[in-house]
């Protein structure tokens, strides 16, 4: 009986050790793959369009403000037939950023 118990403990120990090593190998492979993906993403990233600049060429290229990404807003100027698109911050997000800044200054 002692032999079976000793053999069982040894088997469980070896199994847990081998599974831990396999998990470490998988984690290392995942980390390497993630780093290579991040490097590729940074290399492919392009310049963002600053606030109040024309974004009609790429409507998803607006820069981020402190908390939120600016939105490409298109409109027709008064008396004009051409559509104009610029990166702007919606007013409700502007107010939220101001409130967050005040709270940060109050508690930070």
Swiss-Prot record:
Keywords: Disulfide bond, Knottin, Secreted, Signal, Toxin. Expressed by the venom gland. GO terms for cellular component: extracellular region. Residues 21-44 form a propeptide. It holds the Pfam family Toxin_35. It is found in: Secreted. It comes from the Eukaryota. Disulfide bonds join 48-63, 55-72, 62-87, 74-85. The presence of a 'disulfide through disulfide knot' structurally defines this protein as a knottin. This is U3-lycotoxin-Ls1w. It comes from Lycosa singoriensis. The lineage of its organism: Eukaryota, Metazoa, Ecdysozoa, Arthropoda, Chelicerata.
């Amino acid at each position: 009986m002692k032999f079976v118990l000793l053999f069982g403990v040894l088997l469980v120990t070896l199994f847990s050790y081998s599974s831990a090593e396999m998990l470490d190998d998988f984690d290392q492979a995942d980390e390497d793959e993630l780093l290579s993906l991040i490097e590729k993403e940074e290399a492919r990233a392009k310049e963002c369009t600053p606030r109040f600049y024309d974004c009609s060429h790429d409507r998803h290229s607006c820069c981020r403000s402190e908390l939120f990404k600016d939105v490409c807003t298109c409109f027709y100027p008064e008396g004009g037939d051409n559509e104009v698109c610029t990166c702007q911050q919606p007013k409700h997000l502007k107010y939220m950023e101001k409130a967050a800044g005040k709270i940060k200054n109050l508690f930070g």
